[in-house]
Amino acid sequence: MLLIGSAWIVVNPVPSGPDEPAHYIRALAVAQGEFTGTPALISTQSPPPESTYIWNQTTRSFLLPASLAPGSMYACDAQDWSESAKCTSGPACARWAACLATPSTSGDVRLTTYEGVYEPTFYLIPGLFAHLANDSVNGLRAARLGQLLTAVALITAAGLLLWDERQSRFSLLGLLMAVTPMTLYMNTVVNPVGAEIVASLAFAATLLRIWRDGTGTSKLTWIAAGAFGCLCCIGRIEGPLWAAVAAASLVGLLGPREALATLRAGGRWAAFAVAAVVAGALLDEAWWHLVVSVPASLPGYGALDGLSKVTTVAGALVGLLEGQISGFGWDPGWISAGPFVSLAWGFMVTSLVTLALLVGRRRERIVIALLLCFDIAYTVGDGAVSSVVLGWGSTGVVGRLLLPLSVIPILVAGEVLCRNHERLRELVPQRLSLVLAVPAALCQGIALWMAARAYAVGLDGPLFFLRHSQWRPPFGWSPWLVITTLGCLAIVGAGWLQVGGPTDGAVAVPLVVDTP
């Protein structure tokens, strides 16, 4: 992830991520201790004019160092990849768009951002990295690096928690599938949604480790559960919900009695974990109700009006699922990684979940089924209500915002398969880790290539764009494509190494045996 992510950081033009300039302003402010800012009104250039009423409630202004500040909270390449990203190589006003005069590079400047009221948690590290740079372009890239390193740390922790030396062929399959190209991309641009995804992933992985270890759960695992759960809760407004879903999954997998016994066996460390998660949820509520005000819905509308949009969102489910795999840049008009990536990744996740449902015990199958049903129901409900009540229009939600929820059933399915794969005996490929690693690596590489092509020649340009490139990243395309290739080979290599890993030597259990 570090190799491919590093390539993404540089290959992505400055700026190009969804709402990235607005998030960058927020990160700069948080890093210098400005958490709330001054209320302000958004300009009429807001990308979704129908939701200006909401943005006016979330817009704040901050006093920032002029040398690091962007020219505005917009981007010249937002929502339109019919042309290359060559405008990002122009003067500051062209790059950031909406500038009326060349921005000053000395002293301080006051800028507004429509992302001004969101929790400061996931802005701090990117902002601190940005303050080490010498200008706005390098500042944004440094902030991206801070976001990537945070994600790498959380995903590494999740991998260590999920790793089982006795079942090395299967223990990381869920994690491999949860880190979609979109998960990786969102952690290489400045956007707290990326950190929200991996925080949810890390907390869910910790709870699955508790399920595996039961009453023998170690002190470090309980500490990790408290830390990651608290982080998940205070990252974004939906964080407490993601934490609650993950916790409910653990109780469902263990059963109420076993869950209580596990908590009692954990003693004060289990109490710390529970207290930390609850404290995180309370802090998040305090932020929205005491520090800033929860944005009010559009006047004249209520949640029931969203029912009219249910069929619209339900009909767009396939597109929303695709948006959790690819769909880079600002929306609408985002960059697709192509049908192969969406179909291949979707097929791999479906296969993983199907195998888990086949081998899982009754309770495990119920938990997976409930998680999938809740994921779909929440997607439709949230999209329908947001479309009307908040004025987002269309489906009311985009795929990347749903990834913090979707990673939970994927990880649960991976752990269920790891624990029960012997029930299928020879029907489960012993090289399954390699079978999934090869197309996963290919999808990650293709995703970056398709984004690079849009940046270089636009969406309508030639697929093999290197000789026709109108925009190039620093040092050209070659080093970043080589680094991406090395990262993809590392994924394949990891899958190959797991093929030869040991198993627990368990005797195959017939599928007719079905105990809770």
Positions of the model-derived regions?
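Interfacial juxtamembrane loops and adjacent helix segments
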Residues: 34-140
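Transmembrane-helix signature of polytopic, membrane-embedded enzymes
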Residues: 137-138, 159-181
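Transmembrane-helix motifs of polytopic, lipid-linked glycan transferases
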Residues: 142-166
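Perimembrane helix-loop-helix junctions
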Residues: 206-212, 242-278
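Membrane-interface alpha helices of multi-pass inner-membrane proteins
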Residues: 221-237, 241-248
